[in-house]
Amino acid sequence: MVDELVLLLHALLMRHRALSIENSQLMEQLRLLVCERASLLRQVRPPSCPVPFPETFNGESSRLPEFIVQTASYMLVNENRFCNDAMKVAFLISLLTGEAEEWVVPYIEMDSPILGDYRAFLDEMKQCFGWDDDEDDDDEEEDDY
């Protein structure tokens, strides 16, 4: 019985050694594949965006329509990056400077619900920076993004 156990233990140790060698070989193959993948990814360039990155907005009322069109267009062609209203609002905020940036600070400090509502955020911007209501009706499609 002891001899049988010794033989069984020896067989198990041999199998363990063979599996360890196979595991090492597989790990090396995996390492090579990961390196090859990284090399291939470096060679592939992402497609260029057909819409340029929007300009910043400093609160100048006459530039608000242009700013909204630019940001809406950019978000539309990059919709995978702007999957919800909070992401869209955060993007707009990242482009605010000067008076417009100062305007948004209180909303951020009080964690206003408007920061998660793209349409409401645009409405607040329009109200603060002087957007004519007649233009609002004409440009409603641009706001929907």
Curated annotation (Swiss-Prot):
Checking Pfam families in the record gives: DUF4939
What InterPro entries does the entry give? DUF4939
The GO biological-process annotations, alphabetized, read as: cellular response to lipopolysaccharide; cellular response to muramyl dipeptide
Is Membrane one of the keywords UniProt gives this record?
A: no
For this record, an example GO cellular component is: nucleus
Q: Where in the cell is it found?
A: Nucleus
Record has Metal-binding as a keyword: no
Q: Keywords assigned by UniProt?
A: Nucleus
Q: Give the family from UniProt.
A: Belongs to the LDOC1 family.
Assembly: Interacts with NOD2.
Record protein name field: Protein LDOC1
Task: Provide the species name.
Answer: Gorilla gorilla gorilla (Western lowland gorilla)
Gene that encodes it: LDOC1
